[in-house]
Amino acid sequence: VPAARESLLDAACSALERRPWSAVRMVDVAASAGVSRQTLYNEFGSKDGLARALVRREADGYLAGVERALSGPGDPRSGPSDPHERLTATAEWMMSAAHDNALVRAMLTGCWSERLPSPALSAVPSSSAAPAQRRADGPLPSPGDFVGLVRDRAVAVLGGSGRSAPSDTAELARSCELAVRLALSCVAAPPAEGAVADLLRAVLPRRSTA
């Protein structure tokens, strides 16, 4: 049941904010969500399954946020604004979102503290009847995977109609990857406020921002 699943994930997230993952009890998560413990196990299979589902949801939410940042404000029919501005806004959003969410920060850097769940990134055997859990039991994105996922989304959004010359598309892809890698480095070692934009202005090819 999607609603019950989301309630359970919300409850697990709230529990994780208050105590280390090792101290989070399945029975408490179920009670907080207002469902039976059996419903919790039916949905996720195990505590590790719940951890994988949490990470999968945070990864999906983060990538959705990246797409919103890339699209920018205003009428979506008018197309994206200047690529440099959108890449800068996206890089700043990436850093801010990671700063505010320890689970996202761990996914992007690969540094999982003892307070957090740390499920294996490789796929695990799944016997779940829930499609969402079968997906969560599949491979989870590594920091390197995030670089490719965000870069490809940036190229798709900023490339517009896709009618650009191959050389322009390749340059855009390089600029997008550079912006993503710079943003992720800033997640690990945050710079001063506003420094991300200054760094991007210094390193992005001027032609790609026209």
Regions found by a protein language model. Give the residues of each.
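Amphipathic alpha-helical linker/stalk segments
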Residues: E58-T90
